[in-house]
Amino acid sequence: MDINLILAQKYGYGLTFINMGVMGFVSIGFVTITGQAFNGPVLAALLTVVGFSANGKTVFNTLPILIGVLLASLGSKGNIFTLAVSGLFGTALAPISGVFGPIAGIIAGWLHLAVVQNVGLVHGGLNLYNNGFSAGIVAGFLLPIFNMITDNNNQRKMNIQRKHMNFLKTVQANIKKRIKKNEDEEKK
């Protein structure tokens, strides 16, 4: 039986299963930090995180999301259950953290909890749908912004490199002129 896993194809099954175990422990730690009891929806969210850890979720791209959710909870009135489940299902935003960095992940986690707490009436308060819907809204909102920032930074770096190359070409041309001038003076 062949399990077609992205990380398994790249790193092998052993490291993939280690990553899944580590993400399970991170998820259990998050639920413990929030103080939520392990019930059905929390275990489903935990197993979702573990399962998708075979497709690229790592500690490095999920911790910023969880930190963002925890920081957002400091100023919100939500209950512990919503916090725990939102944090675990909010790791659907892990690619944002993986591509754009941990600060972007913290912002995404922060916004995710805010959206989860405010769009529950749209679909009757079902938490699973609420988190998926909210993750889609947050990703759709943040991706163009982060892409624009990244493009501007890349353009700025390219402009600096272009100026640097022009400077080096000018220096090289001046050196060649001086060498040629010195050779001409030696011939005379």
What positions do the PLM features span?
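Pore-lining transmembrane helices
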Residues: 1-154, 188
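Short, highly charged, low-complexity non-transmembrane loops/tails of multi-pass membrane proteins
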Residues: 152-178
